[in-house]
């Protein structure tokens, strides 16, 4: 019984998080990231993918993370 209640609560939380950003707004944000440059403190890829805006460089912070700084 506890497992069923836990699954229902987790499902409700996931659904509320997904619905927090409307689909159209999410698509606009995604398109802006794909086409434009990345602002400060956004994750980047030094070898491929979106580039940092002018004046910023893609700095490797760890093996798994690089940010525009």
UniProtKB/Swiss-Prot annotation:
- GO MF term set: toxin activity
Among the Pfam families in the record, one is Toxin_7
- Propeptide positions: the record gives 21-34
| Domain topic, free-text comment | The presence of a 'disulfide through disulfide knot' structurally defines this protein as a knottin.
The record's GO CC annotations read: extracellular region
Give the family, as the similarity comment puts it.
Belongs to the neurotoxin 01 (U2-agtx) family.
**Name this polypeptide is given:** U2-agatoxin-Ao1e
Where are the disulfide bridges? 37-53, 44-58, 52-68
The free-text tissue note of the record is: Expressed by the venom gland.
Compartments, as annotated in UniProt: Secreted
Its transmembrane ranges are none
Q: What is its main location?
A: secreted
Leader sequence segment: 1-20
Give the source's domain of life in one word.
Eukaryota
Q: Does the keyword Secreted apply?
A: yes
Give the function comment from the record.
Answer: Insect active toxin causing rapid but reversible paralysis in crickets. No activity shown in mammals. Does not show effect on mammalian voltage-gated calcium channels.
Keywords noted in UniProt: Disulfide bond, Knottin, Neurotoxin, Secreted, Signal, Toxin
């Amino acid at each position: 019984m506890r497992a069923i209640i836990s699954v229902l609560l987790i499902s409700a939380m996931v659904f509320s998080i997904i619905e927090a950003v409307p689909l159209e707004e999410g698509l606009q944000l995604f398109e802006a990231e794909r086409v434009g440059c990345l602002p400060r403190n956004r994750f980047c890829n030094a070898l491929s993918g979106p580039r940092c805006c002018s004046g910023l460089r893609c700095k490797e912070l760890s093996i798994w993370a690089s940010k525009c700084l």
